[in-house]
Structures are given as structure tokens and as C-alpha cells.
């Protein structure tokens, strides 16, 4: 560490602060500290302007910052507290606690800008992470140590799905999770914290009993914080993987806001924008984050990233850049949510590289493909049904349509985290039961069971029990 250098603020434009240093300049990405209204403010060096001046991005509001204020170069990048003591806590982009429970009791810190693991350290494995959510486990299973994208427009259920995954993994697998809230609603962050406390995922009074750490940089934060908070969360997750030998779950809600914040910072720094106004370094920024999320010989990070799709356009540069890094995609479709089927996962658009007979087994693979074939046939028949009606279909097509409608309803299930809203108890469905239920459904074993019996149930036994109830009620 070099001797602390001090400089003076010469210009403040919103979150951008220009600082003049006498002599040697701080390195790009170095953290600068200053005191504003009695509180520490962290800046990150972005550009060397020449004539002894650097341009830095503030990680918090610059209210109260005036010309002539003293700024100190830390000689290092932003460092954040890591370790088990971060579990059950809410931290901000620079690792300061936001939950009014005092400082994080750890002496260990790591820099948020770190190189990705070398090839020699990486490990490849093809193992499924069971989520207990039927549509995901059957049609687009998640790989342990893989990257998953949740794609969807506004209000189709990305955050609810993430909350259910955190809940299921904590309850069934007992692993640690790190949640990075990047530029999303403060209310949702608050709800998530209280729901985690209620479900036992975190204990607000004890890190020993907590299974998740929360790192927040919400919508109201300046762009510098939103552009870096995903890296802070990833650094906390990397500690558990590299030094704790853990299989960690890393949730990002929302990776689009990371790109959006990068575009804002880029514009503030005066860089020429590329397509649709995004930063020219879009691919580089995304790669720097995604390449660090990987499986090593000591542990793994399985990442689930919600991806907001602007105007439901999957060809927008932000979601399109994210696509290339993913092992599985879970696409949420507004048309499915409008039918009242939740989770609103599109069974034909969602993909996974581990849906392979070598990984999931022949029975699972063939059942999944048969389910997709039936749904695809139904989709291609919908125009005929809309114009001519069901009566014009052949007997074989009528059978396919009836099975497809049952499959659509059977792909829905009640969530634990939505119990408060729905009044229906949430369910966790093991993969074996999911595959068995859909296999028998495709074979025509339940052609005489009404389709209403398959809506919002766990497995095939629950569907048959519901059918008996419906029969008795009529």
C-alpha cells in the first residue's frame, strides 16, 4: 500500500466528482474517501483527465460536497467485509450495514474488482440442482455451478420466482445464498428481508443461524452504486466458494439494472454511446462480472439472474448480451400469466444445456421432449381452433389438445412465498414425482380426469385427490 495521497475537489456534477492531486495520481478503480456532513463518502476513480485531475464516480449522494473539500486516496480498490458474519445482514455497495444492527463483526475484507479464476482452477461438472419447481426441473433444469437467466417483462413474476428459489434451496439443500439487489424497488428489498426472517432463512439476531447475505443498491441510489453492487455481492459469494469450500447460490435482481447503471455512468463520463444508447463497453462490463461466476475445484457459485426485458424485446442489446453467458434460460411469458398459470414460465422458450439424457437420464429427457411436442402441436393448432372451433379437429388432434391443456395447468404450482397472497400452501415437488406425473399424463393415463384437477397442485396424487373433490362437489 502506498502512502495516502490527498487531493481537493474541483468540480461536482451530480454523482461525478473531479479531484485534483499534486504529484502522482491514484490508479483507475482506486477508492477515494472523503467526509461529507460528518459521514464517509466513497468515490471510485474512473478517468484520468490530465493536469493532475481525476474524474471519480460517487457511491452515494453528493449532497453537501463542495469545491475545495479534501479527498484521500486509499491506494486500493473498494474493499468489502466478507465471511460468515455477513450472513443475515443487509450491506450496501461499500459493505456498510444498512439494517441498524451495528458493524459487521469481521476483520476480513476483499476487493470488489478481482480477476476471474484461472483455467487451471476451474472445474466442469454436469449435475442438476433440484429446485422443487415442476416446470423448471422438468423442462429447463438448472446445473450446479451454472448460470441461469430469468427473462421477463415488468410484473410477470421474476422476483417471486427468485424468492421461492432462495426459500427452497435454503430449506432443502441447506446452502448459503447471497442476494444482490441491483436497482430494484426498495419495498421489494424490505419485503424480501422480512419474508426471509419469517421463513427462517435468516435470523436477524444471529449470523450463525442465517443462510443468506443481502447486498442492496436500490433504484434510488446513484448510478455508481448500482453499477458496482453486483460486484460487491459476487465478492461475498466468492469468499464462501474459495475459502469456505461451499456451493453458493448467488441471486441478482436485476442484471438489466447493472447494464442500465453502466450506461448512466458511461454517459456521465462523456463516452460515446453504442446501439440503443448503451455504453460502448457493454460486452466487457458483462463479461467481467459473468466470468467470475464459475465452479472451481474448491466450490461452486450457481447464479440465478433476473433479466428485465425492455418492452418484452429479447433482441435488445442488454438481454441479448446476457444470453451468451447463460447455461439455462427461464423465460416468463405474459400470455401465460394472463391465463392465471403461475409460475408463468414458457415451457417452449425456456432452455437448458443440462436437459441431456447423459445428465438427467433417458426417462426424464424423453418425458420433457414429449411434453414440449404436445404443447408445440397445441400451439400450432390454436389458429384453427380460433377460426373453426374444436369440432373441426381430427380425433387425434382433439386428444393432443386435451392433454396439452392438462399439461399447461399441471405446470402451475402454489409457492411458499406467495402463501400470504393466495391462501394456498406452497409445495416442493421432487424431480422423480414430477417426471412420473408428466410421463403418465403424456401416455394418456389421465385422459378422463377433468383439466381443472391439474391446476395449482403438487404431484399427480394431489391432482387425483382434487378430481375426487370436484366430482363430489358436482
Curated annotation (Swiss-Prot):
F-type ATPases have 2 components, CF(1) - the catalytic core - and CF(0) - the membrane proton channel. CF(1) has five subunits: alpha(3), beta(3), gamma(1), delta(1), epsilon(1). CF(0) has three main subunits: a(1), b(2) and c(9-12). The alpha and beta chains form an alternating ring which encloses part of the gamma chain. CF(1) is attached to CF(0) by a central stalk formed by the gamma and epsilon chains, while a peripheral stalk is formed by the delta and b chains. InterPro entries: AAA+_ATPase (IPR003593), ATP-synt_VA_C (IPR055190), ATP_synth_F1_bsu (IPR005722), ATPase_a/bsu_AS (IPR020003), ATPase_alpha/beta_chains (IPR050053), ATPase_F1/V1/A1_a/bsu_N (IPR004100), ATPase_F1/V1/A1_a/bsu_N_sf (IPR036121), ATPase_F1/V1/A1_a/bsu_nucl-bd (IPR000194). SUPFAM superfamilies: C-terminal domain of alpha and beta subunits of F1 ATP synthase (SSF47917), N-terminal domain of alpha and beta subunits of F1 ATP synthase (SSF50615), P-loop containing nucleoside triphosphate hydrolases (SSF52540). This is ATP synthase subunit beta. The gene is atpD. The keyword Phosphoprotein does not apply. GO terms for cellular component: plasma membrane; proton-transporting ATP synthase complex. It catalyses: ATP + H2O + 4 H(+)(in) = ADP + phosphate + 5 H(+)(out). It comes from Magnetococcus marinus (strain ATCC BAA-1437 / JCM 17883 / MC-1). It is a peripheral membrane protein. Belongs to the ATPase alpha/beta chains family. Its EC number is 7.1.2.2. It comes from the Bacteria. It is found in: Cell inner membrane. Keywords: ATP synthesis, ATP-binding, Cell inner membrane, Cell membrane, CF(1), Hydrogen ion transport, Ion transport, Membrane, Nucleotide-binding, Translocase, Transport.
Amino acid at each position: 500500500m502506498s502512502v495516502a495521497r490527498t487531493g481537493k475537489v474541483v468540480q461536482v456534477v451530480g454523482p461525478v466528482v473531479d479531484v485534483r492531486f499534486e504529484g502522482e495520481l491514484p490508479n483507475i478503480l482506486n477508492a477515494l474517501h472523503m467526509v461529507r456532513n460528518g459521514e464517509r463518502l466513497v468515490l471510485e476513480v474512473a478517468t484520468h483527465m490530465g493536469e493532475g485531475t481525476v474524474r471519480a464516480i460517487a457511491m452515494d449522494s453528493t449532497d453537501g460536497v463542495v469545491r475545495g473539500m479534501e479527498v484521500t486516496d486509499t491506494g486500493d480498490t473498494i474493499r468489502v467485509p466478507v465471511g460468515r458474519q455477513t450472513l443475515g445482514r443487509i450491506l450496501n455497495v461499500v459493505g456498510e450495514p444498512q439494517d441498524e444492527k451495528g458493524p459487521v463483526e469481521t476483520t476480513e475484507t476483499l476487493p470488489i474488482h478481482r480477476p476471474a479464476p484461472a483455467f487451471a482452477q476451474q472445474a466442469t461438472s454436469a449435475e442438476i440442482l433440484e429446485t422443487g419447481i415442476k416446470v423448471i426441473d422438468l423442462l429447463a433444469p438448472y446445473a450446479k455451478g451454472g448460470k441461469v437467466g430469468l427473462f421477463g417483462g415488468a410484473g410477470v413474476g421474476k422476483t417471486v420466482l427468485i424468492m421461492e428459489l432462495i426459500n427452497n434451496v435454503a430449506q432443502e439443500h441447506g446452502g448459503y445464498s447471497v442476494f444482490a439487489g441491483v436497482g430494484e424497488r426498495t419495498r421489494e428489498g424490505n419485503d424480501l428481508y422480512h419474508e426471509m426472517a419469517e421463513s427462517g432463512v435468516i435470523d436477524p439476531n444471529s449470523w450463525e443461524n442465517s443462510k443468506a447475505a443481502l447486498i442492496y443498491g436500490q433504484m434510488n441510489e446513484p448510478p455508481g452504486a448500482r453499477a458496482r453492487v453486483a460486484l460487491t455481492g459476487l465478492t461475498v459469494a466468492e469468499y464462501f466458494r474459495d475459502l469456505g469450500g461451499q456451493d453458493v447460490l448467488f441471486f441478482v435482481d436485476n442484471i438489466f439494472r447493472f447494464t442500465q447503471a453502466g450506461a448512466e455512468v458511461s454517459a456521465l463520463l462523456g463516452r460515446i454511446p453504442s446501439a440503443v444508447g448503451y455504453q460502448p463497453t457493454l460486452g466487457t462490463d458483462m463479461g467481467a462480472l459473468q466470468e467470475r461466476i464459475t465452479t472451481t475445484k474448491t466450490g461452486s457459485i450457481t447464479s440465478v439472474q433476473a433479466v428485465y426485458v425492455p418492452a418484452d424485446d429479447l433482441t435488445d442489446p442488454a438481454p441479448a448480451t446476457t444470453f451468451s453467458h447463460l447455461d439455462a434460460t427461464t423465460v416468463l411469458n405474459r400470455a401465460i400469466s394472463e391465463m392465471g398459470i403461475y409460475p408463468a414460465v414458457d415451457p417452449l422458450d425456456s432452455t437448458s444445456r443440462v436437459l441431456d439424457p447423459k445428465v438427467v437420464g433417458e426417462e426424464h429427457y424423453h418425458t420433457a421432449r414429449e411434453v414440449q411436442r404436445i404443447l408445440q402441436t397445441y400451439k400450432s393448432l390454436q389458429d384453427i381452433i380460433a377460426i373453426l372451433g374444436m369440432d373441426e379437429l381430427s380425433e387425434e388432434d382433439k386428444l393432443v389438445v386435451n392433454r396439452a391443456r392438462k399439461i399447461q395447468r399441471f405446470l402451475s404450482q402454489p409457492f411458499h412465498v406467495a402463501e400470504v397472497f393466495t391462501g394456498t400452501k406452497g409445495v416442493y415437488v421432487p424431480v422423480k414425482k414430477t417426471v412420473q406425473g408428466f410421463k403418465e399424463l403424456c401416455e394418456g393415463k389421465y385422459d378422463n380426469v377433468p383439466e381443472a384437477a391439474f391446476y395449482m397442485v403438487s404431484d399427480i396424487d394431489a391432482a387425483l385427490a382434487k378430481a375426487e373433490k370436484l366430482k363430489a362437489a358436482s
